[in-house]
């Protein structure tokens, strides 16, 4: 008899089974396998400008118009935003929150966290913001500067701690195997008493930023293994037992259906074309 399973297969299968969906993904069609062509939450795009220069970012590689993408009338949640740093247009963020709350929607804000302060966080909460996602993929000033081009690590970490006092706070981290493994483990340990959740994403490489990644010392041959992603998330969860450490829901729902042997051998396609928003566009109503 040929045995294709081993101890690591059982471990991976168990990790996928016990991982919980991040709150941002609740209500998204992407976690419903019965929907043939699922759509993610609609988004409101305010600007493509950003005060960081992240080496893995796709935002500067594609032109996206300001406006609403997707059907708000059929949605439960809207995301502000998926391109650029929305807090560069703080007044636009405030108007977007008010507009969406009038429609009875949950509002999730995605930001790099550099422009936050306690006053802004409290004001956004008072306007009805439900959830904030702050990007942080390192646990040192040096690695942060290498990834983003700026020296804002301490500011962002402090703003995460402030935000968690007022809002459901999710830290979004990019996992780069062989590059920031220990950084993420230490970050999880630090956030155990602050953030509510950490959502770990695999690094996606685009042709346009491939050289930037290589110049930073990232080995592109290490990217994409589901095995590595599940194992790092499991170790991060051990370091942060008080909070939920997980992966994006539309991937997790698929992995939960897979055998451990498949999980141990499957590779995610991390070499991609720059994403484009192929959804209905409407201008902002304000």
From Swiss-Prot:
Family matches, as CDD domains: Radical_SAM
Gene Ontology MF terms in the entry: 4 iron, 4 sulfur cluster binding; catalytic activity; metal ion binding
Keywords, in A-Z order: 4Fe-4S, Iron, Iron-sulfur, Metal-binding, S-adenosyl-L-methionine
SUPFAM superfamilies in the cross-refs: Class II aaRS ABD-related, Radical SAM enzymes
Protein name: Uncharacterized protein MJ0804
Entry keyword annotation includes Iron-sulfur: yes
Obligatory cofactor(s): [4Fe-4S] cluster
UniProt: [4Fe-4S] cluster binding residues: 50, 54, 57
Ranges where the Radical SAM core domain occurs: 36-256
Lineage: superkingdom: Archaea
SMART domains cross-referenced by the UniProt entry: Elp3 (SM00729)
Cross-referenced InterPro entries: Aldolase_TIM, Elp3/MiaA/NifB-like_rSAM, MoaA_NifB_PqqE_Fe-S-bd_CS, rSAM
UniProt keyword Metal-binding, yes or no: yes
Note describing how the cofactor binds: Binds 1 [4Fe-4S] cluster. The cluster is coordinated with 3 cysteines and an exchangeable S-adenosyl-L-methionine.
Family matches, as Pfam families: Radical_SAM
């Amino acid at each position: 008899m040929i045995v294709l399973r081993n101890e690591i297969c059982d471990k991976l299968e168990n990790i996928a089974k016990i991982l919980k969906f991040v709150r941002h993904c609740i209500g998204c069609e992407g976690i419903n396998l019965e929907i043939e062509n699922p759509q993610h939450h609609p988004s409101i795009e305010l600007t493509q400008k950003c005060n960081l220069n992240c080496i893995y970012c796709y935002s500067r590689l594609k032109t996206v118009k300001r406006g609403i993408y997707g059907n708000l009338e059929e949605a439960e949640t809207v995301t502000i935003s998926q391109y650029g740093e929305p807090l560069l247009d703080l007044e636009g963020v405030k108007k977007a929150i008010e507009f969406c709350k009038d429609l009875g929607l949950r509002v999730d804000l995605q930001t790099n966290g550099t422009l936050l302060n306690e006053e802004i966080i409290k004001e956004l909460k008072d306007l009805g913001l439900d959830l904030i996602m702050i990007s942080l993929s390192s646990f040192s000033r040096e690695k942060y500067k290498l990834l983003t081009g700026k020296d804002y690590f301490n500011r962002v970490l402090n703003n995460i701690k402030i935000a968690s006092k007022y809002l459901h706070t999710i830290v979004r981290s990019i996992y780069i195997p062989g590059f920031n493994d220990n950084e993420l483990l230490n970050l999880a340990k630090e956030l155990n008493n602050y953030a509510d959740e950490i959502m770990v994403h695999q690094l996606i490489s685009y042709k346009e930023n491939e050289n930037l990644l290589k110049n930073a010392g990232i080995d592109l041959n290490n990217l994409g293994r589901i095995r590595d992603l599940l194992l790092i998330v499991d170790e991060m969860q051990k370091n942060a037992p008080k909070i939920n450490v997980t992966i994006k829901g539309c991937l997790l729902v698929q992995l939960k259906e897979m055998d451990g042997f498949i999980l141990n051998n499957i590779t995610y396609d991390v070499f991609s074309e720059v994403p484009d928003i192929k959804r209905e566009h409407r201008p902002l109503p304000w």
